[in-house]
């Protein structure tokens, strides 16, 4: 190996160049030996992967389990909301107070919920009798368990004061309306106010979550209701932590959903939408059931595309079965990874649907690159040497890209990831990448060895029979010549490589390369990139987090229908926020009262403190000290029927003869708009800091906070860590690769593709949830997988001009890139027909990933690389210097030998 020093080049530059050359040659030598090993022992490398697949695949069938805890999967694993839940539950058990802590979709425990929606223009309050009939049907519904019949009254959550079932207050309002209708009174006699209304027993009740689509009486100071479109009723079940009770509750929920479907057929004037505690999990898992057949269709499409794109008219050099076997190689590696996952007690969830597509996109890239590497080898070499040369040419880059896949998804599986679904996905993806790499160089490499042996012995690539001689073919019909032709007629004197006749390679060489490097095309490509960058930047400014669980459910499921109706008619108020004062407080102190009022300002409050202050004022009672305050509270206020329910909101302690209030709770409800979730997160972020700055020590909690607390940060951390990891690896290897500009261009290309996918998916109404984040991590690797070979071939090319270098790069790697991206995109098409929000997100993100990568590899990079470094002039100068030196030597020889001139 000889290294010539440039004039003026420092010694360190020489050493770095030597180190890069040694590393590159060392890796190529290792891959060459690996190829020789595989070519000499193909049966062994074919058998071992097959045995592994059979072993782990069969084990997976016996251990298949699904994940039933949705909170564990999609809620942030470590959040302040979970700590607040633990503290709040230690003070006031959540199972007893879940009726007060209303939450849209994340109510804890078991329950049944129904929305009754009237026809457009109708007032649902005038249909009280029909709604109460539905209510009575629920109350009388029975479920059988071990010979005993259970009704709602056996399973319901009981009130502490009278041990009756906890029911929504809207039921009491409807009873009053029905009685008024029966007694021929006008509905004006029953005053329904919104959001707070006064019940018959004297209580003030918040019904903002039970009455929807409200139209108030114009100019009404007391917020009287003129009409309403929807009513929401929730039936809360008690579980007691018993497995038997939980089983009975599950049966009751199933019967409840069946009853709602039956009642919908009977009540044509009302639309019924039901929800139960298991509905979200059922509709989340439903995506997997809906996708089964579509995944098989996707596999068939990829197999067909790979087979056709690997074919040629030349029956000797065509490799259709290698394309098919390459896809099957990736499939069995995925099956092995799934077996390992289930053997290690993994539980399946619908987010893992992306792994086959992710692994296929990377695995088939290695398959097509090996096929292209085989075509670039010399035909006159033995097939074992050709396999080794193909490994030496391809496996270095494939090893590097596989390592980056492992690093990025390994970082996603690290403890820094706060979403369990993302962590599980990344762990499985790491295993899939390792097995993918092993199966490509072993199983598919063995298939390549057998195919090479058939080609060397001149066997037909499809029928595996000997190819007749040219003289024999000339005497046969045209159809026989077409089927059995080995391409001897197509090969001309100026084109000695028969593989140049592959239709993709021929198209790129003869048509596309000349067109894309045309000087008149380049301005339009620059304009196209500016448009691409503008839309991407515009989308990046509109990113929104996807904390809503609806993004992961089947789109035609009852849960999604319920959530849409709920969002439309019950979005005026946030979920009920529990305001827990967990330290003793001087409630009788005027400054404390002012602080409480200031904290509760802007909220609709359901507060014992506010009601008590009003009671003292109305009764003209003075309670300015601790003794009077607590005495009147216990002996008078809490004993009145309309205030007895506040007993559950205060914790008293007795020290000697003195009573103390050690903790209490209030309920706050914020006014919201259609974007309820975002506004609730803003309210939470504003209230929490106040608990540290104010003299009142409190926490705020609602069950939905567990799913939304810092979700946007939790979900974006994996892609940020993965991106940082890729950037760090590329920077650290800046001086180890054969040309540093290759890494520089790779960083720019990957950044452009990543930001393009991020911006365009936002414009396509894709939120930042766990699925889109996983796709963004994959985009980093997919871009590197396809851009790296193209860029490194370009920077190492020694042609005279950049245009010739990019043509050479496209001719060398363009076929494999186009084959892989085309197969990848065609394989995504069946996902479009799965009625699921999860698969819609997966389809959109992966389609943008493939599309943006294709755009950069075949349009943007071929044009931009002709404008910017690396310059190819020094190669031209070197060749001119060598030619000039050779001419001078020839002249000297002529001068020294005059006889030669005379002879000539």
From Swiss-Prot:
Gene3D superfamilies per record: Multidrug efflux transporter AcrB transmembrane domain (1.20.1640.10)
SUPFAM superfamilies (UniProt xref): Multidrug efflux transporter AcrB transmembrane domain (SSF82866)
InterPro entries xref list: Patched_domain-protein, PTHD_SSD, SSD
Pfam families noted in UniProt: Patched (PF02460)
Compartment(s) where it occurs, according to its Swiss-Prot or TrEMBL record: Membrane
Domain of life per record: Eukaryota
Record's keyword terms, sorted: Glycoprotein, Membrane, Transmembrane, Transmembrane helix
Chain positions carrying an annotated carbohydrate: 149, 625, 820
Family: Belongs to the patched family.
Protein's job: Could act as a repressor of canonical hedgehog signaling by antagonizing the effects of SMO, as suggested by down-regulation of hedgehog target genes, including GLI1, PTCH1, and PTCH2 in PTCHD4-expressing cells.
Protein name, as recorded: Patched domain-containing protein 4
Organism: Mus musculus (Mouse)
């Amino acid at each position: 190996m000889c290294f010539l020093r440039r004039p003026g080049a420092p010694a360190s530059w020489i050493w770095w160049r030597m180190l890069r050359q040694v590393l590159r040659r060392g890796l190529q030598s290792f891959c060459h030996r690996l190829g020789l090993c595989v070519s000499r022992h193909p049966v062994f490398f074919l058998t071992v992967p097959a045995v592994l697949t059979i072993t782990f695949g069969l084990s997976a069938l016996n251990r298949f389990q699904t994940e039933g805890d949705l909170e564990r999967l999609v809620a942030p694993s470590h959040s302040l909301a979970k700590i607040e839940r633990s503290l709040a539950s230690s003070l006031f058990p959540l199972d007893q107070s879940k009726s007060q802590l209303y939450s849209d979709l994340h109510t804890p425990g078991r329950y049944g919920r129904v929305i009754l929606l009237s026809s457009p223009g109708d007032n649902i309050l005038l249909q009280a009798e029909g709604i109460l009939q539905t209510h009575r049907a629920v109350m009388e519904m029975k479920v059988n368990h071990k010979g005993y019949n259970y009704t709602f009254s056996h399973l319901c959550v009981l009130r502490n004061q009278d041990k009756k079932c906890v029911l929504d207050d809207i039921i009491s309002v409807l009873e009053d309306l029905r009685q008024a209708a029966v007694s021929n009174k006008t509905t004006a006699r029953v005053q329904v106010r919104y959001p707070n209304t006064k019940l018959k027993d004297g209580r003030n009740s918040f019904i903002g979550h039970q009455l929807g689509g409200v139209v108030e009486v114009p100019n009404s100071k007391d917020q009287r209701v003129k009409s309403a479109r929807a009513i929401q009723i929730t039936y809360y079940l008690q579980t007691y932590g018993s497995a038997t009770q939980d089983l009975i509750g599950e049966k009751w929920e199933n019967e409840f959903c069946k009853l709602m479907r039956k009642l919908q057929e009977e009540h044509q004037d009302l639309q019924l939408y039901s929800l139960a505690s298991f509905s979200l999990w059922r509709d989340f898992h439903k995506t997997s059931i809906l996708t089964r057949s579509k995944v098989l269709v996707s596999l068939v499409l990829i197999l067909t595309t790979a087979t056709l794109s690997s074919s040629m008219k030349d029956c000797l050099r065509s490799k259709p079965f290698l394309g098919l076997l390459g896809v099957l190689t990736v499939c069995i590696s995925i099956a092995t990874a799934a077996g390992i996952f289930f053997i290690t007690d993994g539980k399946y969830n619908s987010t893992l649907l992306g792994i086959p597509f992710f692994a296929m996109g990377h695995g088939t890239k290695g398959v097509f690159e090996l096929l292209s590497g085989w075509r670039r080898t010399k035909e006159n070499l033995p097939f074992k040497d050709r396999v080794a040369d193909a490994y030496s040419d391809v496996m270095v880059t494939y090893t590097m890209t596989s390592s980056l896949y492992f690093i990025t998804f390994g970082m996603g599986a690290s403890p820094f990831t706060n979403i369990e679904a993302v962590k599980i996905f990344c762990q499985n993806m790491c295993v899939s990448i390792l097995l993918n790499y092993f199966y490509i160089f072993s199983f598919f490499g063995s298939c390549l060895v057998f195919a090479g042996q058939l080609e060397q012995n001149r066997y037909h690539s499809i029928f595996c029979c000997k190819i007749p001689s040219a003289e024999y073919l000339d005497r046969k019909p045209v159809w026989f010549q077409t089927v059995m032709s080995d391409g001897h007629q197509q090969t001309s004197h100026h084109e000695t490589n028969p593989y140049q006749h592959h239709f993709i390679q021929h198209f790129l060489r003869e048509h596309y390369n000349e067109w894309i490097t045309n000087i008149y095309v380049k301005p339009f490509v620059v304009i196209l990139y500016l448009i691409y960058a503008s839309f991407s930047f515009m989308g990046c400014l509109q990113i929104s987090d996807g904390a809503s669980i609806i993004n992961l459910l089947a789109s035609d499921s009852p849960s999604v229908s319920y959530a849409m109706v709920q969002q439309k008619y019950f979005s005026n108020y946030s979920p009920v926020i529990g305001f827990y004062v967990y330290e003793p407080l001087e409630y009788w102190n005027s400054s404390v009262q002012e602080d409480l009022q200031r904290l509760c300002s802007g909220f609709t409050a359901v507060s014992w403190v506010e009601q008590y202050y009003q009671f003292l004022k109305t009764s003209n009672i003075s309670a300015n000290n601790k003794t009077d305050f607590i005495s009147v509270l216990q002996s008078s206020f809490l004993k009145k029927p309309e205030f007895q329910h506040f007993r559950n909101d205060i914790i008293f302690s007795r020290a000697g003869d003195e009573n103390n209030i050690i903790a209490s709770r209030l309920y706050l409800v914020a006014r919201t708009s259609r974007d309820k979730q975002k506004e609730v997160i803003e309210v939470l972020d504003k209230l929490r800091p106040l608990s540290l700055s104010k003299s009142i020590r409190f926490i705020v909690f609602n069950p939905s906070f567990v799913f939304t607390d810092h979700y946007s940060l939790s979900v974006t951390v994996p892609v940020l860590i993965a991106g940082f990891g890729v950037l760090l690896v590329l920077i650290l290897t800046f001086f180890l690769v054969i040309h540093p500009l290759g890494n520089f261009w790779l960083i720019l290309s990957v950044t452009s593709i990543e930001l393009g996918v991020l911006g365009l998916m936002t414009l396509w109404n894709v939120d930042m949830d766990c699925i889109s984040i996983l796709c963004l991590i994959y985009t980093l690797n997919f871009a590197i997988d396809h851009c790296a070979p193209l860029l490194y071939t370009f920077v190492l090319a020694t042609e005279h001009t950049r245009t010739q270098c990019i043509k050479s790069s496209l001719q060398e790697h363009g076929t494999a890139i186009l084959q892989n991206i085309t197969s990848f995109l065609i394989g995504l098409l069946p996902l479009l027909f799965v009625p699921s929000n999860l698969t819609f997100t997966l389809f959109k993100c992966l389609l943008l990933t493939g599309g943006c990568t294709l755009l950069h590899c075949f349009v943007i990079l071929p044009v931009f690389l002709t404008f910017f470094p690396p310059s190819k002039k020094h190669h031209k100068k070197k060749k001119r210097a060598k030619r000039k030196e050779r001419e001078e030597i020839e002249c000297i020889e002529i001068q020294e030998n005059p006889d030669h001139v005379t002879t000539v």
